[in-house]
Each structure stands twice: as structure tokens, then as C-alpha cells.
Amino acid sequence: MRSKKIEGLIIRSKAQWISHGEKATRYFCNLEKRNFLNKTVGFLDRGNGHIISEQGNILKEVQHFYENLYSHNPAQDLDLEYLKNEAVLLDQGNTADLEGEITIDEVKQALVNMKNDKSPGPDGFTAEFYKAFFPDIGIFLVRSFNEAFSKGELSVTQYQGVITCIPKDGKPKQFIKNWRPISLLNVSYKLLSSCLAGRIKTVLPVIIHNSQKGFMKGRYIGENIRLLYDTILLTEKENIPGLLLMVDFEKAFDSVSWFFIEKALKFFNFPNNIISWFKILYKKANSCVSFNGQYSNWFKLHRGCRQGDPVSPYLYLICAEILSLMIRQNKKIKGITLRDKDVLLSLFADDTTLYLDGSEESFTEAIKMLEIFSKISGLKINNDKTQIAWIGSSRNSNVKYMRDKNFIWDPGTFKVLGIHFSVHTNEISHINFDGKLDEVKREISRWNKRNMTPLGKITIIKTLIVSKLTHLLINLPDPPLRFLKELDTVIYRFLWGGNTHKVKKSIMCKSYEDGGYKMLDIYNFITTLKIGWLRRLNEIEGTLSTWANLYPNLTKLSIFGQGYVQPCLKNIENPFWADVLKHYRKLCKVKRNSALKLTDVYEEPIHFNMNIKRSRKVIHDKEWESRGILQVKHVLNENGRPLTYNDFKLKYANTNTTARLYAGIINAIGKFLDNVKNGNCNVKNVLTSEVWACIGSGNKFVKELLLKDNEIPTALHKWNSEFNNLNWKSIFIHSMKISPDPQLKWFQARIIHRILPTKKYLHLCKLTHSPLCVFCDSHVETLNHLFWDCNFVQSFWKDLIKTLKEKCTHCVRLNLSKELILFGKIENVYTDKAIDSILLYAKYFVYKCKLQERIPLIDQCISELKHRITIEKVLASRTGKVNTFKDKWKLYAGMFDAGII
């Protein structure tokens, strides 16, 4: 009995690893975490030298801290009517969809959006539970929500939440203020809150100023980082005075007044329905604290937006917009003027940065507005964490306003939205990237001890290693080339367990269907990230108008040809945008892998097009540019031929273009069209229109364009000399679908790429004395010989087929071939999916026998197959695919234990 339990435990453990061990799942990402140890503390320091070490007293202290944090703190009332001239308010057209009863479709969508594998609330019911039983309980859930609205309150359990404390990175854990409270709320409550959040967020872009970048679709944290970096740079380059005021609100989400939230909702004309729902959600909210594995007593909440509540971020944004309005309407607060563009304020939720002209009046008025907002909202300005830095021509100033406030003046370096800044922009990249390689190496060393395939290591590289750098790579100038080279070396050394690349780097980065494994190319990765800024620059009208004003030439990249990049680079001093241009130029130099068609070039730009030259120079006519004559199609008739000069004058009246100038331009265009039509075009790179089609479609398409070439894996040249007409695309895809087990996937991949070590290879490397087969000891051991040509292996395959025929009378009659054994099902030769698995398991069994230097025997193979099928069954039961498993193996009950299948 005990041995059976142990065997079952081993099987379930293997199934867990196969299912999640090399994928970006919660199980995988938690393998190297020490969450419990990280979330425990042996003592607390009250800050006055008083240490608390007894666990019961620690829990009481934590409860007291949060009970006090969420206690009622009367906020002052203030008439906000004076702000309405600056504000955009909701009207009936905006609010129609905010009212009405909660619908089942809203709840269903909220449930779909909920992630699995998340900690439940106090009642213990998970999102998976609700998803499984929603067809049965959904209608009752919706009724309960609408009944709660009628009664004006929720049930007792729906109000409950457990506050779990997460320590802030890099801050001493013995101080309770350095822990972040996250509320674990019941899923039923979160579904209701999500429905209301879904309604509210649809109107936020209407009322929330573009200076706020938090929690709204189409707004991006990087825009605030970009604004800060470019402001520091331009004030420095153009000798403009400026002052940065970086405000820190203490526990902002947790201390905002409920009275103020209601007042803000009314100010923006939210309907009574939404205001009533807000009151219902917060009316009897109560929590306990989970700390050091213990739970405190329950206590009521009287203020704050609970972190973990789906509606909280949106309620906070509405409150923060009041502050934004107060600052923008105060004309005594003057921002920094950069190239006729005024920069004053940027926010990301509670992260607030003011860009001031440096005058005392602007500073004191800004502080005045902040203090008034603090009094009416319940938020407290954390003076000893609020940082102020002189920038531009004032960066060496010693002036300090309001010294009694104890603000941090001239902090040297300061952190905003995850990026470390300095008033000297040439230091910013070094500050952020120094030490990152050591951090990457430490992460790799933690994973190096695990026996993982390169497929699993690719997952680690993408999710846990490069992710440490992504935020920096998107928002800062590129790190030095030596940094990237060392990073690339470290990553690939980890991937292959040494310096030898067993498969070419360029092949590893390709898609599965092209013989690759979606490995990350760090250089292409950075290009893809940086190119995203060009998409943002062109697709969101108004959002990035700051950069359209600061760097107007950048907005013309999409309408001009590739010859425009070099003039732009000469005129731009910003290292970040210069890097963006260089990556764009790299994208434009991608080689074509298909012939040009005439229709391809109609969308091509006329100006700065390297393929359309007049007197060996690219064309740029300012009148044509101003009149929107930008693309080849703009000077073609309906038959695709160039317009005559008279037709051109009719289409573009009052033109200043002379007949001679027009003839010169049109001859250049006509020559390009004729060359394309006749197949004489020597265009080697992708077209500008193709590049922008990819940029507009998203990062995935940019990445695909960068990988666009006709290179094939080296091993295919050898295989193609041995086999005719193999469908490699089918073979590649099949190898990744043949098994959920990453070990078996990689085993098959090593065969395809001819990197599975045979004795012939080991002998060449002087790692073995003989190249002869471990089974027959008479022929050189190659892949062909090991899996097919060897007499012992041939005998093994015959025994397997014989066993199949004898014990599985209804299974497919299979004619084995060398291609089938080596590569699996190449075409739709048979529909029996179990055969694929049997052949793969058997082939892997042969390989294990080779390593153990024993002859492959059918009885041992059948035992191995039973074990693997049992693991498959466990996997099927965990993923809800038991019926699929049974359909796959039903014909083989005679060969294996019927109980297994």
C-alpha cells in the first residue's frame, strides 16, 4: 500500500512538472521564490526605539496600525464649482451606459477577465469555482447583486477582506509602514466591483486630463518617463530654468476620504446609480490582517480605496483629477516652456510630478494647492519623501523655498516610476544599467542548478531574466554595446550550458514552423521595444502632441521614405530619440524575401524614397508635401499610370509645379514602376509602406519582420540529401505538439537538428574510444543507425508492431519507415493519435537503452509506455480532458492495463 502511494505521488509530481514546470505559469515562477520567508518578520520597530518581538504583540501592533490607517479622518469641505471652467464633465450622452441593473453579460465578462490561480477571499471560493459553476449559479448571483442595490447593502461576507502585507523592495521590514497592504476580497464581491469598474472606466478618458497616465487604455506609463527625461535634457541643452517637484502622498490609496470620493463623483456628474453603488460597496467594509501566518481580529474601515478591489484604481483617478484641475486652473503656477509647448504636470495614479518655472510664486502656489487638496481629500503629503530638483540652467542653484517644510532638495538622483534620474542626463543610463548584469547573473545562477531543457530555459530568459531590463530598455537610451554583448553571451551560455551554440542563434529565434524555438534576440528585442514609440507617435492623436511639438520631424517618418532618417539623425540631439531612429533604420534595411508586385509600390512615399531619384538625388518638394501629394498613388490615374501634366494641374489646382519639374519627378516614378512591372527592379530591402504596416500592426509584426529571411536550419541540408520531399514545416510544428513533456519535445528537436549526441559525434570530439554502435558494436553509430538501421533496433520495432497487432486488433495497421521513426507523422498518413505517442515513447526508450548500454527489449518498453500513459491520464484529469484521453487510447486497452485507460 505504501509503495503504491509513493508511486502515485511520483506520477503526480511528474505530471505537475510536465504541465507547468517549463511554462510561464504561477507554479513555474514560484519555484525559486521564498514567499513565506519574505513575508515574515521576527520583530517590529515602532520608530522610537521600542522593539516588539513577541508574536502576539506583533499581530496586535499590525492590527492597530491598519485600524488607525483606515479610521475616520474628517476631511474639510470645499466648494469645487470654481473648477468647472477647467473641467470636462459628463453629460447625459456619457452617462446612459452607467445606469441600470447589473446584467449577466457584465458578470460573465468580469469572470472571464479574472485570472486563475489567485488567492481567494475569506469565504475560500476561487475564480475557478465560479467559472466552473457559473452556468448554474450565474443568474442567482446577478439577482443577489441587484437585490443588494435595492436594499442598499451587501451580505456580511461580501464586505469582508483579508489584508495581506507585502514588504516593499529594498526597505527595512521591521517598520510596518514599509509594507504594502493588499486586500484579499471574496470573488463574489470582486465580480460586482468589476462590473462597476467596467462601467466607470468607459467614461474616464472623457473627464481625466491627458497628464494622467494610470489605469486607462491607450495611456502608457512610459509617456511620463519620456516627458521627464526629455524635459531634463531640453532644459539642459537650451539653458532653460526649471524646477521639478515630485510629490509623495503617504499611503494615498488607503487614506483617501470616502466623503471626498462621493464629492468627486458628484462633481463630474456621475449618475446617482454609480454613487449609490459606491456607498453600498464601502458601507460596512471590514477587514482583518494576515501577518506572520496569523490573523488579527476584524475591524471596520472608514476610508481608503482597498488595493485589490477592482474599482479602487478608477475611483482614485477621479479624486486625483481634482488635484490636476486645481493646479491647472491656478494661473500663478507656471510650468516650463519647451519649444512653445508648456509642460506643467504628469501623474500616474498617485505618483505626481510638477514641472515649474522655478519662480518662488509658482512653487508656493503649487504647495498651497497641494495642501488644500490634502485637507479636502484626506491624503497626507509626505514632506520628508517629497523631492525637489533644480534642472536646466538652474541645476546648480542653492535656493531652497519653504525650508521649514523639510522637503528633500537636490537629491542627486531620484526615482520616478521605476527609473532612476539625475539632473545630468548623461548619467541616467549608467545609474540604471550599472549592476543589472550582476543581477541577471544571480538570477541565472539560481536556475542553473535545475535540470531543464533549453525550451524551459527560453521561458526563464523571457519571463525572469530579460524582464528585469524591459522597463529600462523601453524608456531609456540603449545601453552601451559592450553591455549588450556581455548580456547576450551570458544568456546563451545559460541556454546551452556552455559557450558552444548547438543550433545557430538566428535559427533559435525563429518561429516553431520555421524550425526555431522563439528564443529572444536581445538586439531585435530592443528594436521592437523602441519602434513601439513611433507607433505611439502616429496612432494616438493628441496624446503625444508634446513630442510632435518638441521633435516635429519625427512625425514625418511615416510619410517620407527611408532617405529621411539620416537628415533626422543629424538634427536630433536627444540620445533616446536618436536610438529610436537608428532602430527604425535597421528595420528599413531588412532584406526582401519575395518579389515586388506593381501594386506594392502604389503606397510608397514619393519624398526621400531611395528607389525614386531625380538626378541621383531623392525627391523632396515642399509644395507637394504641404498639399498632401505624398504617395506614388497620388500622381497615378485610375489605370495605374502617371498623370499627365494637364491632369495633374486639374487634380491639384493652382500648383506652382512647373512642367519641367513635374516631368523630372514623374519620370523618376515611372522608371521605378516600369522596373517593377518588368521584373528588373533591384529593390533589396522591404518597402517603407511595408515597414509602417508592421509598425502599425504591433510589436509581434515588427518582430516577425526582423526575422524575415530564407535561412533554414543547417541540419536540413544533410537531411534533404538523405530524404526526398520532406514537409519540414509540418515536421517542425509536429515536433512541438507531439507531447506536453518538454524533455520529449527537446529530444525530438535534437534529432531534427542533428544535435543528439551519437557515438560517432562523441568519437570525433574525443569523448569516447570507439564510434561503433553500443548495441551491435559493428557499425558506426549515427542517428539513422541508432533509431533504424541497427539489427537490434530493427528487431525491437518488429516486436513492437507484432505486439500491436496481437493485442490491439482494432488499431491502425502501420507500415514503419525510417522517416516515420525519425520525424514522426509527416503528413496525414493515419488519424490514430496514439500511434504518434507510442512511437515517440518507444524511440525515447531506445535512446535511454543506448545511454544505459543495454539492448532494447519490448517487455521493458511496454512497462515504460504504461508509466507514461498513466502520467498522461493524470494530466488529462487536471486539465479537464479525460474524454479526449480516453478517445485517444481506447483502442489500446488490450495492450496496456485497461484500468489505466
List the predicted regions and their residue ranges:
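Short, charged alpha-helical motifs in flexible N/C-terminal segments and linkers
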Residues: 1-65, 100-157, 163, 233-241, ...
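Conserved pre-catalytic core of RNA-dependent polymerases
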Residues: 32, 70, 94-322, 326, ...
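Short, conserved micro-motifs composed of acidic
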Residues: 86, 293, 381-412
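Catalytic palm active-site di-aspartate
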Residues: 121, 160-163, 180, 212-214, ...
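Family-specific functional microsites
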Residues: 172, 266, 402-405, 411, ...
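Basic, alpha-helical interaction scaffolds
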Residues: 405-478, 531-543
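Extended C-terminal regions of large enzymes
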Residues: 487, 500-757, 854, 864-901
